[in-house]
Amino acid sequence: MGNITPESIVNDLRYLQLLSRSFPTIADASTEIINLEAILNLPKGTEHFLTDIHGEYEAFQHVLKNASGAVKRKVNEIFGHTLRESEKKEICTLIYYPEEKLQLIKEQETDLGDWYLITLNQLVKVCQNVSSKYTRSKVRKALPAEFSYIIQELLHESSIEPNKHAYINVIISTIISTKRADDFIVAMCNLIQRLTIDSLHIVGDIYDRGPGAHIIMDTLCDYHNFDIQWGNHDILWMGAASGNDACIANVIRMSMRYANLATLEDGYGINLLPLATFAMDTYADDPCTIFAPKMNFADAEYNEKTLRLITQMHKAITVIQLKLEAEIISRRPEFGMENRRLLHLVDFERGVFVYEGKEYPLRDVNFPTIDPADPYRLSDEERELMHRIHSSFMNSEKMKKHMRCLFTYGGMYLVCNSNLLYHASVPLNADGSFKHVRIGQKEYWGRKLLKKTDQLIRTAYFDEDGSDEKQFALDYVWYMWCGPDAPSFDKDKMATFERYFVADKTLHKETKGHYYALRNEAEVCDRILEEFGVKPGPHSHIINGHVPVKTIKGEKPIKADGKLLVIDGGFSKAYQPETGIAGYTLVYHSHGLQLVQHEPFQSRQKAIEEGQDIKSTTLVVEFNSQRMMVKDTDKGSELVTQIQDLMKLLVAYRTGLIKEKQ
């Protein structure tokens, strides 16, 4: 306080008067300073980074429950050789799935009272361990109200002292005798899960392919501390929820392609009956062979009749999508995407695609809804169909709830504890300089580009209908999905038409932007970090997802001398044949940075019944010789500022500039 004088705080008096309402006396302000100083010297909480979950809700939920192997590690540390491996496995499974595991135990256990006594004591030990790096206040806020007092007593009493040992045993025995053991065990297990992960970062792509994006969003909406950096698939769904019909068509097409209807129908109550009726009528005699869904990634078993219907719906929505996208491209010549309007290059009579002077035979030649003289015009039936589907998307309450969550906790990028998080790319030129991208009348690049696109995505959803700004933003959200200079995409094109209709694979090629090659260079990564206000150093990193790391071919997730980490390891089953693994979690705790590599998750049922955990391999990316404390984090910087303000308030009290309120 030595350098704070009454003169130096005169200009801060209005703010200090407001602060004095929360801390009305010298004693209150002093106590808060002591509390904050104590917090600064605790170990930093554990951050978990996940990316490209793609609707794989069971694997996602399991990784949250087992904290990427941290719970198992702690159980091993605590019980070591005092328990058999099978017993430690039982404790872990109970912590992950308390309700389901309790059900099984009750069917098998002969002496339930004894089991309760042993298990509750074991859970108390685990809970004491995971809560030890937090203040009592923080732990208290995480406690379920009905058991708050009892859990606090159990956590903060040592069972080594004989008197206290008896006290703890009485509490546990009473929990059992009052038939509250089940509820108490569930509460303890959930608390252990919650305290093991302090904060969760989702670096994009919750949606697409897998069956349960809506279940993942439900989990996140109730999660205690998380943030999201939007991925291209998330943005596509946000565009659909904002009312962009091209985005809506894309979302439905992807669902049909992977035969995953659960998110649309069960999750969001989207009525697909109009599409089914239209597809059955329009393509009644059409085998639609090339539109058969990829069944090895489907969310359910379908009979032949249903599969036939999904195939017809897939074709119907794909044709509609190509027309809707052409409308945006014509309306927005500034997007520079004329090369994605391709239907007028089709000779429908001869069934060939004429591209750059060369003819390519089409894989499908039946287009009853396309008028060769005006190929981009929606038929009256197609327009009516899109009107009905649009209305269904706009009226889904569950979708509105999830979108609010994505907007509240999400953004295009995040800087957190010297780490820069974004899903895909920051567009670059070949020389490594930032690419200037024109949006409207201005050019944006680097950080400004990501901020501008973030703002446009929000405008598309929240702005009043009818304004020019809203209409442009709505169109731009679609550009963010497939536009060449979109930071969430950054390829020369999305070859949707060619991949469906042309067999020649030379036309399927999508060339990635310069970023994806240049991000291997440390100098380029340093320049990007500086652009986003992160000082390059040994503990500064860029964290990306988006491009699956082909571990099976020897590709490494750690790039540019450790400055950049790509943590898309294939949560999505569709990518696991490419990656050879089933996802990464990056874990950043007080001892350093670890990359956890997961093998495929069998199923929730096997985890509960057989105690099957995800097999994970931990790679140490960085080891801190000294433990990282809260004072070394962004939160620590905030607390230091609060302490300085409270110090000023103390000076104001002690010099009479502000009077204490008794």
Regions found by a protein language model. Name each.
Residues M1-Q662:
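Feature recognizes metal-dependent phosphohydrolase scaffolds
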